[in-house]
Amino acid sequence: APRPFVDKAGIFSGAKERIFQSSPDMFETMSSPLNDDLSEVIVSRESATMVPNQWRINLETAAETQITFNQDRHPEITSARRERFTINRADGFESRVTVTLPTGYSDGTRLPAMFWFYPREYSEQEAYDEGFQTFNKNRFPNVGARSMSILTLLGYALVEPDVPIVGPEGQRNDEYPHDLRNTLAATIDEIVARGWVDRSRLGIGGHSYGAFGTANAMVQTPFFKAGIAGDGNYNRSLTPAGFQSERRYLWEAQDLYIEMSPFFQADRLSGSLLMYHGMDDHNVGTHPIHSDRLFHALEVLGKTASMYKYPFEDHGPATYETTLDLWARWV
């Protein structure tokens, strides 16, 4: 695992001296120096099984004093079994998947699964692989108010696949539908082959560009029974000057914009789609009208869909009341 460090460098000589480095079995970062020569510092320390806490450390004497005493409030989730592995798509591209299985899971038990993802664009395999130089297995699996790992308490497997969209500069999204389908298909085949998941009981979800990907997955594939899409964009013609890593204007790549827009493929939606949107979403690409229009289209087409809009929420639920309501709808 990568080991964060701090070096002291001579301005004129360029000579370096390492004054701090994380332990190999921990994830430690320097939070703050306490004096000019960095002989005393505050360090954040955590591991895969130890919740993050802050320590005051004298780097000269190695004396340590713990100054925060955070506790793991969700041991039944953080102790869940996590598997991280590589899959091979039909086109030969290799990508990574993380699967979280409920605490106490018995091998061979096929579970319903929830996919949660966010597509990202890359120029090639090497560019994708470079992003994993910073992955650290010693990070503690924190649980937030909207962490989908909470679903493991209900007996679901959580599947978090990387979904690389690959193409050269200026043509990044030309293979978007194919890359999306191929990655999801390869992921499903692998987790089914490992005996973890029931292929007939799959859901999918995501937030923002992940919501866009979710709606696309449900119109481009027959794999999923249900989807959750939050604060998404579903009609790329409403972002005509580009989006994500797409730099072509709508008028240069009109067919691509339409092909990538779930709104224009809404008649092909399989499964049930739940959408949620903050009514004060100020993100330039995800105006609430996107959810309004897609919901109306699905309603006209007789598809099973629901939409929940939350007042005073921006691009991502923040309030206690909204979070509780979302979980009530999701489960």
Question: Where are these predicted regions, by residue range?
Answer:
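Surface-exposed, flexible loop/turn segments at secondary-structure boundaries
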Residues: P24, T49, A62, D72-P75, ...
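Non-catalytic accessory segments flanking enzyme active sites
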Residues: R3-T109, R146-S149, L153, E190
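Short hydrophobic segments within beta-strands
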Residues: T100, W116-F117, G205, Y276
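Active-site-proximal cap/loop segments of hydrolase catalytic domains
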Residues: E126, E130-V331
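Short, well-ordered beta-strand core segments
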Residues: V41, M114, G227-A229
